[in-house]
């Protein structure tokens, strides 16, 4: 580890009050805790977020689908960096930050020797499925099964919306099959987890795997992943695993609060704004744990209330028709990725397809947006009430920050008073010395006689 990197990590962990916007995240965590092997300090919640985030990396042609020795995280990170440098291909979501993270992982005694096995990546437009998963052999007697969240593909986003009216989407079905396959291939206790849709898949797999596999799952991590329909969270299967599900959301969560949850949330402080708090790099860490808050923001509650009210008013058949109609319009661009939709030629294709939409589908889409608007308006009174309450009673971290500022002001006053007293004593001593010297000079002639 470079001294500059260590210094940066130390500054963030010890708290640089001059730069309150700089707080430690998963990068700093790797720099700060990376010298502690998992055998010495067992896997923690922050490790689980990091491994879940790494499932977004494009391991294609780097990690195989077999459950043999696999490839070390150090070697995988090196290859990812080489391919990115050579071909300018994307990594996970933020190339600049991802490169820093991968470089730190390569030097980390905690992570570099973790083995990657069983990598699968599947995008099927016909089945409207986007699914990817990888298993990490931790080297301390357990395996971490990580499910990837939504990627940049249009079909991946479509599958997310399908969750609002489907009892089971293809990725959830494959998550169950994958977890059971891991259990047969590896004779180790299991931890399953994921970020965003990956967290939903992890929870779903924990619910619906066979009894033998479920018995080996120690913990299920859901990092800001959406919930389920009411039938699923009321099911017997959910009750068999709910005590092992650990759900984490940022204070202004808008993704993790979607659909219905029955398990409690752990609220993590994020320095992101609004929906950008979904980015794992914005989650704040102190030492070996997240900085936790006691309450979500009014914006998060407003989004939660709005979406739930909208789903209750918009029946499943209408949801399907509206979502299928919008997807058909977007698919007219022939763009595979969401970013492709913003290219000029593709935008024109989308607009043309929207104009050609049949009357029934157009009515369903317009009704969906009308109900969404009315749901938002219906949630305004509650939002205003929560906002007023949050102004009257600040969140704990804000209170701590203001207390720290108050303490700093008091300390500054004490120091100023102490300096003033010291200065006054110094002036007094100087005055006394000068008076003594003057008196000595006056007496000098008399002594000479």
Task: Locate each region found by the language model.
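Alpha/beta hydrolase fold serine-hydrolase catalytic domain that processes acyl esters and thioesters
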Residues: 2-3, 10-46, 51-65, 70-133, ...
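Gly/Ala-rich beta-loop-alpha elbow adjacent to hydrolase catalytic centers
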Residues: 193-198, 202
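Short glycine-enriched nucleophile-adjacent loop
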Residues: 202-211
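Intrinsic low-complexity repeat tracts in disordered regions, enriched in small/polar residues
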Residues: 414, 432-433
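Acidic, Ala/Val/Gly-enriched low-complexity intrinsically disordered segments
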Residues: 418, 436-437
């Amino acid at each position: 580890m470079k001294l500059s990197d260590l210094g940066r990590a130390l500054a963030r962990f010890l708290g640089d009050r001059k730069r309150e916007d700089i707080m430690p995240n998963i990068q700093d965590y790797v720099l700060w805790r990376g010298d502690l092997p998992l055998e010495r300090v067992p896997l923690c919640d922050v490790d689980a977020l990091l491994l879940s985030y790494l499932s977004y990396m494009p391991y294609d042609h780097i990690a195989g689908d077999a459950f043999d020795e696999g490839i070390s995280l150090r070697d995988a990170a090196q290859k990812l960096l080489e391919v990115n440098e050579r071909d300018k291909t994307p990594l996970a979501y933020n190339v600049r930050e991802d490169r820093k993270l991968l470089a730190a992982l390569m030097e980390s005694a905690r992570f570099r020797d973790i083995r990657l096995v069983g990598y699968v990546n599947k995008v099927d437009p016909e089945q409207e499925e986007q699914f990817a998963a990888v298993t990490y052999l931790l080297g301390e007697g357990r395996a971490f099964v990580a499910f990837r969240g939504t990627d940049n593909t249009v079909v991946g986003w479509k599958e997310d919306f399908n969750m609002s009216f489907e009892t089971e989407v293809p990725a959830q079905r494959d998550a169950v099959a994958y977890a059971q396959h891991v259990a047969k291939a590896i004779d180790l206790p299991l931890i399953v987890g994921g970020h965003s849709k990956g967290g939903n898949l992890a929870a779903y797999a924990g619910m619906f795997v066979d009894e033998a596999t479920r018995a080996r799952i120690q913990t299920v991590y859901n990092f800001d992943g959406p919930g389920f329909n009411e039938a699923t969270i009321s099911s017997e299967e959910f009750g068999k695993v709910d005590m092992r599900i650990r759900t984490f959301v940022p204070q202004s969560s808008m993704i993790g609060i979607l659909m219905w949850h029955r398990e409690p949330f752990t609220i993590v402080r994020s320095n992101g704004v609004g929906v950008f708090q979904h980015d794992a790099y914005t989650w704040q860490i102190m030492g070996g744990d997240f900085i936790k808050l006691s309450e979500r923001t009014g914006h998060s509650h407003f989004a939660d209330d709005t979406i739930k009210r909208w789903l209750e008013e918009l029946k499943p058949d209408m949801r399907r028709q509206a979502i299928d109609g919008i997807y058909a319009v977007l698919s007219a661009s022939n763009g595979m990725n969401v970013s492709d939709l913003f290219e000029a030629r593709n935008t024109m294709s989308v607009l043309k397809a929207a104009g050609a939409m049949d009357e029934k589908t157009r009515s369903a889409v317009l009704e969906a947006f009308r109900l969404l608007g009315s749901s938002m308006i219906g949630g305004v009174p509650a939002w205003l009430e929560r906002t007023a309450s949050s102004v009257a009673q600040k969140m704990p971290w804000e209170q701590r920050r203001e207390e720290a500022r108050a303490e700093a002001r008091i300390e500054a006053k004490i120091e100023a008073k102490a300096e003033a007293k010291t200065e006054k004593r110094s002036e007094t001593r100087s005055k006394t010395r000068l008076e003594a010297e003057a008196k000595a000079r006056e007496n000098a002639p008399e002594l000479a006689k």
